[in-house]
Amino acid sequence: GFIPSPHCPVDTLMTSQTAREDYMGIFEDKEMRLAGLNTSGNPLSPLPDVGPRHAYDLRRAIELAGKLGITDLVCMSGTPGSDRHAKYPSWVVNPWNGVELEVLEYQKSVVDLFWREMDLRAQDAGVKLALELHPHNLVFTPVNFLEFAERIDARNIGVNMDPSHLMWQGMDIIAAIELLGDHIFHVHAKDTVILPGIATRGVLDSSFGPVPDDPDVRVQTGMEHYCSSWPSDPAWRFVAIGNGHDVTWWTNFLRAIRDVNPGMNINICLLYTSDAADD
C-alpha cells in the first residue's frame, strides 16, 4: 500500500508458521490482540509503479490476514484513470455533465471487476475487507458504498467507519452509521477540525503545495510518490480525537457504534503534526 510496513515482515510471515506464531506471540505476551491489518493504497491507479504494486500488496495482505487469523483488513477502493488509456487517476466528485458520468461508468466497471475478485479472495481466507471512505477514492461516501456493494453483491466487503473523512464533507456521522448498519466492519477513531479557512475555500480545496524538499517530513503515498504540502490556512485538518469534536459528540458516536455492534473494536488513530507540537 501507500506506507511501508517494517513493523510487519510480510515476506517472512507469509512463508513461516513459526514466524507467524512468534509474531502473534509478541502481542499475546503483552495481553494485546491485533484487531486488524491495513493495506491502504490505490490498487487501481494507472500509474505503473503504483496500481500493480498496491494490488499485489492487497492480495498478499488478504492471504496473510487469513494465515494469522486476523479477521479485519482495512483498505481503500482505489481510483482508476478516466479511461483505459489514462496516465493518472481521476477522482470525479461532481459529475454534473455527461462526460464525467461516462468517466464514472468506466471507473465503476474497473472497480467492480477488481473487487469481485477481492471479495472471493476474502471469503476464501475468512477475512473481512473494510473500505475506508477516504478522499480520492471511487467509494468515498456511505451512499456510493451501498451502491457499489449492491452492484458486486459484496459478502466480505464492508466499511471502515473513520468519521474524520465524513466530517469534512459535512455529513451527519450518526445518520451515516445508521445507514450503513452492519456493513460497518471496523472503526477508526479520528477527528477533523473545521477551520476558518472554510469560509472562502470550501471543503473541496485544491490549494495544496508541492511535496516538501526535506525527505524527513515527506509522507509516502506510493513508490516514489508523496503527499502534497497542506495549505497554510486550510478549510479543515485531521486531528486527534477531541481536538475537533467534544466529549458529548464522541459519546454519541460510540453509542451509535454500540447499537450496530456492541463488540466492535474502537481503534484510536494517533496523529502527530507540527501544529500539535506547538500547542
Q: Predicted regions span which residues?
A:
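Conserved active-site loop/cleft motifs that coordinate metal ions or position small ligands
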Residues: 186, 264-271
